[in-house]
Amino acid sequence: MSGGKYVDSEGHLYTVPIREQGNIYKPNNKTMADEMNEKQVYDAHTKEIDLVNRDPKHLNDDVVKIDFEDVIAEPEGTHSFDGIWKASFTTFTVTKYWFYRLLSAVFGIPMALIWGIYFAIVSFLHIWVVVPYIKSFLIEIQCISRVYSIYIHTFCDPLFEAFGKVFSNIRINTQKEI
């Protein structure tokens, strides 16, 4: 750890005790974090959410962005009355807007809870089951791969090398008869 040095009563040179340098696990001293070239970590659970741009990663640009013109269209030559068209547009837009709000008010929190639990389980399984299983499999497969490699080099390589030498002398001539 970085820090100053001090001399004790007997004249021995020591570094500053770790406890005086700040928390050894998570430095809360900004100068210490700067000295150690650590970047500041922000908690993902306390960040502010953007109430204007609610899809900053554009997950739903091509899927759910449905307007009146995307669903209902009258081709040239088959037009309804202008008043009907305007009323249909307003009805579609307002109904979609308020029904979405109603559904999100009723089911939004329970669905967020369900998806939160689901992704917590998936994350837990990935961290505590999948990755350790893959690592242990890779460790175990190394032993098998060494035995397999010895088997291949001992038995199969000479066999296929012999086959190669036998079949290397075969010549095929093709002639076209008229």
Swiss-Prot record:
The modification Phosphotyrosine is found at Y6, Y14, Y25. GO terms for molecular function: ATPase binding; identical protein binding; inward rectifier potassium channel inhibitor activity; nitric-oxide synthase binding; oxysterol binding; peptidase activator activity; protein heterodimerization activity; protein kinase binding. GO terms for cellular component: acrosomal membrane; caveola; caveolar macromolecular signaling complex; cell cortex; cilium; endoplasmic reticulum; endosome; focal adhesion. InterPro entries: Caveolin, Caveolin_CS. It is found in: Golgi apparatus membrane; Cell membrane; Membrane, Caveola; Membrane raft. Phosphorylated at Tyr-14 by ABL1 in response to oxidative stress. Residues 2-104, 126-178 are cytoplasmic. GO terms for biological process: angiogenesis; angiotensin-activated signaling pathway; apoptotic signaling pathway; basement membrane organization; calcium ion transport; canonical Wnt signaling pathway; caveola assembly; caveolin-mediated endocytosis. Residues 2-94 are annotated as: Required for homooligomerization. Residues 105-125 dip into the membrane without crossing it. This is Caveolin-1.
